């Protein structure tokens, strides 16, 4: 099957792992099945189309018949929101489909490369012999000040007041998967609700071809993290508080794998993951530390954005708040036609803050996208500088590193073959900021189980600290999050 695909980027700007970077080529270790996954060129159309119908009745009645008459095959359809994914349509068929009174928008997917990373540093091994800790304030890297993000956001004050989240609150991590066997995450992931929508893609004649759901090592679940990113994000939301403290450590995590070991995915895969999380997985919170910058005026993009908007609005109607990363391209989203998706369609879009040389923890991160029309709040994402000696690892965000990390430069995280050593990575990006907000949402939801999505959003926005220009500003909008205040004002 030809895959009509956009490749989403995970939104990490810097990894402190030996000489690792988010854009490193994928190693043939531990298996060589992915070796051509990065050979699909940016911008190449791959044969799949998203069709957005004017109403939900159109798709289930005449819509499917029309597509078949034009020579297309409906690969996936969501009648409740009027969206279908189609393969096999010619250029003339696309024109005819767009002209139909049944159809609102039609768009060809296309390949996009992930956003590049820049800075690197060193990995750290966790101390051996430590056990899960009920008190996140006792986690090694919180106690020594490395997890500064938990302090500035008021998480540590919330812990001291007894707010740790509850098992009944469920957070879906839409990402590269989760290393559910890492000591920080063991027992926290609901395996029965976890799933993978990530596919392995190879290039054949300049066209992306879907070879099926990304395979795993023997014994691993389909949602195992073969990268590192999803595990890092997940352990920021919740952890066993051994070396790193989780923001809301007692909540339940759901691994929804939508990005492959290349760190990229498709609009269809991400949208399918959202529907799974909000539907059968029954998530209260969705974290998406991923995204793509697209030109709203480019042909077909409107269909992709409208599809994503409908999927997210449907999730919100089911009671799920969707929190996404703004991106790391230093783009002013108030200007021009660039759209950061899915952030700008999400309930809350998150920019990043962080210190340089451990000074001014609330300054704007050098890489973050911004814009008052797009961003809702900011959170600690870590900071980097192009100047030699302009930042230290401690300016970044530390969290767990997957034992299946795929890049050759990340293989230090695979060193614990006997389970004796677990590794942690420093990283910076809006990817790292977003799970702080997801953790805040989970903590508020745990304390207020009946709170609505609107009430949850308002509590997060209106409790944020004004850390930039007085009033709402283009970099943080409502401010940098403060969960201790949010818990006081939440309805």
Where do the protein language model's features map onto the residues?
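Sec-dependent bacterial lipoprotein signal peptides
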Residues: 1-20
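Bacterial Sec-dependent N-terminal signal peptides
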Residues: 16-45
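Substrate-binding/access-modulating region of protease and related hydrolase catalytic domains
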Residues: 25-26, 165-167, 240, 258-346, ...
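Short, surface-exposed ligand-recognition loops at beta-strand->loop->(often short) alpha-helix junctions
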Residues: 50-59
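Structural recognition of the beta-strand scaffold that forms the well-ordered cores
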Residues: 50-51, 85, 170-174, 235, ...
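Autoinhibitory propeptides
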Residues: 64-146
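Active-site core segment of subtilase-fold serine proteases
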Residues: 135-251, 272, 279-285, 290-295, ...
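Extracellular S/T/G-rich loop segment that most often corresponds to the catalytic His/Ser-adjacent loop
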Residues: 342-443, 486-488
């Amino acid at each position: 099957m030809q895959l009509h695909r956009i490749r989403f980027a995970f939104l990490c700007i810097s990894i402190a792992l030996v000489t690792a970077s988010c854009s490193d080529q994928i190693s043939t270790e531990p298996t060589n099945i992915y070796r051509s996954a990065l050979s699909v060129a940016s911008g190449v159309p791959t044969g799949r189309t998203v069709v957005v119908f004017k109403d939900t009745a159109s798709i289930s009645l005449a819509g499917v018949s029309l597509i078949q008459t034009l020579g297309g095959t409906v690969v996936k359809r969501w009648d409740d929101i009027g969206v279908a994914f189609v393969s096999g349509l010619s250029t003339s068929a696309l024109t005819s489909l767009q002209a139909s009174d049944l159809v609102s928008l039609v768009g060809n997917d296309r390949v996009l490369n992930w956003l590049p990373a820049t800075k690197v540093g060193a990995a750290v091994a966790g101390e051996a012999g430590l056990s899960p800790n009920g008190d996140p304030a006792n986690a090694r890297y919180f106690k020594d000040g490395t997890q500064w993000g938990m302090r500035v956001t008021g998480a540590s004050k919330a812990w001291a007041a007894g707010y740790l989240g509850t098992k009944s609150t469920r957070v879906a991590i839409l990402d590269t998967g989760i290393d559910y066997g890492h000591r920080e995450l063991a027992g926290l992931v609901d395996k029965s609700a976890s799933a993978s929508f990530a596919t392995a893609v190879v290039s054949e004649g300049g066209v992306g071809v879907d070879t099926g759901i990304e395979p795993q090592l023997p014994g691993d679940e389909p949602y195992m993290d073969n990268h590192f990113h999803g595990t890092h994000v997940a352990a920021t939301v919740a952890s066993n508080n051994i070396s790193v403290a989780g923001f809301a450590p007692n909540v339940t995590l759901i691994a929804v794998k939508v990005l492959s070991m290349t760190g990229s995915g498709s609009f269809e895969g991400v949208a399918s993951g959202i529907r799974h999380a909000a539907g059968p997985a029954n998530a209260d919170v969705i974290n998406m530390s991923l995204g793509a910058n697209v030109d709203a005026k480019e042909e077909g993009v409107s269909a992709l954005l409208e599809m994503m908007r409908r999927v997210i609005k449907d999730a919100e109607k089911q009671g799920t708040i969707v929190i996404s990363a703004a991106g790391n391209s230093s783009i002013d989203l108030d200007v021009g036609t660039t759209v950061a998706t899915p952030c700008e369609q999400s309930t809350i879009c998150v920019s990043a803050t962080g210190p340089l040389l451990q000074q001014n923890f609330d300054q704007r991160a050098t890489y973050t996208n911004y814009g008052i029309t797009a961003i809702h709040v900011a959170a600690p994402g870590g900071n980097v500088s192009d100047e030699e000696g302009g930042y230290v690892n401690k300016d970044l965000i530390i969290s767990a590193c997957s034992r299946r990390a795929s890049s050759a430069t990340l293989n230090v995280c695979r060193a614990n073959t006997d389970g004796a050593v677990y590794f942690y990575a420093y990283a910076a990006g809006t990817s790292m900021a977003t799970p702080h907000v997801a953790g805040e949402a989970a903590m508020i939801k745990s304390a207020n189980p009946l709170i609505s999505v609107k009430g949850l959003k308002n509590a997060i926005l209106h409790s944020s600290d004004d850390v930039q220009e007085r009033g709402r500003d283009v970099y943080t909008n409502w401010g940098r999050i403060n969960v201790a205040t949010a818990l006081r004002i939440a309805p």
